[in-house]
Swiss-Prot record:
Locations listed in the record: Nucleus
Annotated function: Involved in the homologous recombination repair (HRR) pathway of double-stranded DNA breaks arising during DNA replication or induced by DNA-damaging agents. May promote the assembly of presynaptic RAD51 nucleoprotein filaments. Binds single-stranded DNA and double-stranded DNA and has DNA-dependent ATPase activity. Part of the RAD51 paralog protein complex BCDX2 which acts in the BRCA1-BRCA2-dependent HR pathway. Upon DNA damage, BCDX2 acts downstream of BRCA2 recruitment and upstream of RAD51 recruitment.
Domain of life: Eukaryota
Gene3D superfamilies: P-loop containing nucleotide triphosphate hydrolases (3.40.50.300)
Protein name: DNA repair protein RAD51 homolog 2
GO CC terms in record: Rad51B-Rad51C-Rad51D-XRCC2 complex; replication fork
Entry comment on modification after translation: Phosphorylated on tyrosine residues by BCR-ABL.
Region (Interaction with RAD51C): 1-75
Quaternary organization: Part of the BCDX2 complex consisting of RAD51B, RAD51C, RAD51D and XRCC2; the complex has a ring-like structure arranged into a flat disc around a central channel. The BCDX2 subcomplex RAD51B:RAD51C interacts with RAD51. Interacts with SWSAP1; involved in homologous recombination repair. Interacts with HELQ.
Keyword ATP-binding: yes
Main location: nucleus
Keywords: ATP-binding, DNA damage, DNA recombination, DNA repair, DNA-binding, Nucleotide-binding, Nucleus
Native source species: Mus musculus (Mouse)
GO molecular function: ATP binding; ATP hydrolysis activity; ATP-dependent DNA damage sensor activity; double-stranded DNA binding; four-way junction DNA binding; single-stranded DNA binding
Amino acid sequence: MSSKKLRRVGLSPELCDRLSRYQIVNCQHFLSLSPLELMKVTGLSYRGVHELLHTVSKACAPQMQTAYELKTRRSAHLSPAFLSTTLCALDEALHGGVPCGSLTEITGPPGCGKTQFCIMMSVLATLPTSLGGLEGAVVYIDTESAFTAERLVEIAESRFPQYFNTEEKLLLTSSRVHLCRELTCEGLLQRLESLEEEIISKGVKLVIVDSIASVVRKEFDPKLQGNIKERNKFLGKGASLLKYLAGEFSIPVILTNQITTHLSGALPSQADLVSPADDLSLSEGTSGSSCLVAALGNTWGHCVNTRLILQYLDSERRQILIAKSPLAAFTSFVYTIKGEGLVLQGHERP
């Protein structure tokens, strides 16, 4: 909540403009200053600054509410609770699809379809609500230069040929997907900090970061002293910003992650496990055992609300597992990648 922009907490536009000249643009910036510093910046009296502090503090501190009030508020919310993946069996298991208002992580080895899934979800978010979409824009943050507009158009035309039957509709969908390439942790964090205004001005209904692990693993070598602490600090701040945006605007946020090898006598949790090695017992760990797990560690694993793991079965078939979800049980589905994106085997799309 401290990431909330000052323009959205009731301060006058003139005061916000004055504060922005000192790089004070959100609640955290404002509340980090002393009353004396705020008096110098705003030109207000001590009493005026005290009233501002009360206003800003109240805006970024959520009020207590009962479970019934929370349920009633969400039921009355006009925004959908899920974004359908159009993979019927997966949607059914997830009780509707990718949940709005929380973080969904897609994890797996290279080439298993993480980016394909993200591009497919970008198309779906731009569709009219009558087709299961959110009828909004998408912010696609690409850290690996893996996104291609040609693939976006191919998935759109192949998955919904009856809807995308004109050049105009293809142009509309492609113009709603806003691509941002961020190749450093600093650039990614700055982008996330500026997303709030972009979500409002462009009517964004889906945020994708593909991939969060790419920039982190390039810049933070875990073998160097102090890097783990700095890495977790960056991940915590990034997750906090994304959780705020997801909850404040009731939109889904999709992140992709990579895999790494876990070498330890202690077993990882089921939500982290991607593919056990032959020498790993699932009932008890042994010294020197190894397995493939989601990258970025336990701290990051607790930040995401839903985790889907993609993995290979053979050269053609792949598997998607629901490894972590507040709603769904641990289950898996077999899929292939075709022109229209991901296609579940044995489950026909309507």
